[in-house]
Amino acid sequence: KCVNSDVNKSDYCPLEAKLGHTLIMVDFTSRWEKPQIDWVKGRIFGDALISSTPPYHRISYLKIDNTPPHSQKYVYSKCRFKTGTKTRFEGDKVNSKCEGSDFINTIYKTWRSQINEVENSFFPKNEDAEQSLIYEYLVHVLREYSADFGSNYQSRELIIVSDLMQYSERVNFFKHCKSAAELLKPKKQQKADKCGSFEKLLKKEKSFANYINATKPNNEMLKNLNVKVLFINHGYQTRKDLYITLQDLWEDMFKYIGISNYEIVPQIDF
């Protein structure tokens, strides 16, 4: 490709093709500690981002917070510009037929500075949220045309950075992740300690089952899709049973709604 004729100058994306889209959703509904921020930054920004994302693939950052999914806007959504150097991606090299190395290097530096600005302002002051709409955000980006994350992209990767403790009016894992012993305590003292199975949740909560069946993505929405979860280990999840059973709960839900290409990467305890 030639930058001058084939690339949109405002977002660095190809004019004629949708090559790929990496959408990074980060859950800010629980408080973050510095080790968690450092771990996540090292995976979704900087050299890790550039070395894992081919040139001219779109990169988008979306925050999960108290904002309803349909009202949330991308923090950033542009394509990864070519480095102008030899990498494992053929498209990173300067096209000597129509490009100069200084020209490409100047644009790359501009693009890189924009990504650095996003990184520096991305992690807000800690605030607990009243709800955690992880599932709702997941369904939103797969279903809605406005998210620009459709199967018309040749490849799609959805990266979810979260502690996975989903709690909303319709999908409440916090309620489902308390043992019988925990439920005997006064309500204000109850904490999540162990999750029941997804199958049990479907049988026990008919409204939950109906909601999942009504909102789960269809086959077209799942084409060319890979999902990666960076599983944040928040302080209250140091209980081993909770950490393991919560991961199992999400794996079973992914399978139920049709997501087969997924990977859950747990944060190492700190």
Task: Identify the role of each PLM range.
Residues 16-33, 116-124, 229-235:
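Acidic/histidine-rich, surface-exposed loop or edge segments in extracytoplasmic proteins
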Residues 39-48, 139-143, 208-213:
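N-terminal post-signal-peptidase region of extra-cytosolic proteins
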Residues 8, 228-270:
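A cross-kingdom marker for long, charged
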Residues 165-242:
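VWA/integrin I-like adhesion module and closely mimicked acidic/polar interface patches used
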Residues 1-15, 18-153, 157-160:
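Von Willebrand factor
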